[in-house]
Amino acid sequence: NNSNARRDLGVYVVEEPNPRAVPATRSLRFLPVEYPEQEFFPGRKWHFDSEALFVFEEKLYFLTKHRVTGETAAKAGTNLYRLDSNYTDRKNVLTLVGSRTDIVWPTAASVSPDGNSLAILTLDALWLFSKPRVGDDWLSGKLRQIPLPRDRTRQVEAVCWDDLITLRIANEQRDLFSFDLTMVDSPPRGDSKP
């Protein structure tokens, strides 16, 4: 939704394929979605684009990318939404859960295997949030930010956990990076919410 004008946003549900056995997969169903704050197409604020999704407690979450209105340029900020319904015959209105003003263009997100940490990938940093004490506003948890050397990592687009301390990051150029969180010098920050 780069221009924030699409009215046909949605999620394709597929079975998780075995990449070694299945060269292609099919959509099981399509879940149309809409952002509750978007009244105009394109929106007055260009805050209705998302490619960073994650699952927590069997719910799908979306992190938005904000753009300078009328342009494709990145703007700081992200909103966290939750998909609460699974309608196929009408739009599923997303629920706004939280927001931050300092995250620029989240491209991927993943919850740790134990469900206690969320990794959010942006073009120049890896943001690690602890599970919130109450509710599901992950953006309110304790934060640890790890800068990424963009000259090496380039256009990063995917993140996943190998285990509780190792993350894998892939970029658009098909390079794969492994991060051992115990080897990265970036102390956690306390609860802070810009």
Regions found by a protein language model. Give the residues of each.
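Sequence/structural signature of beta-propeller domains
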Residues: 1-194
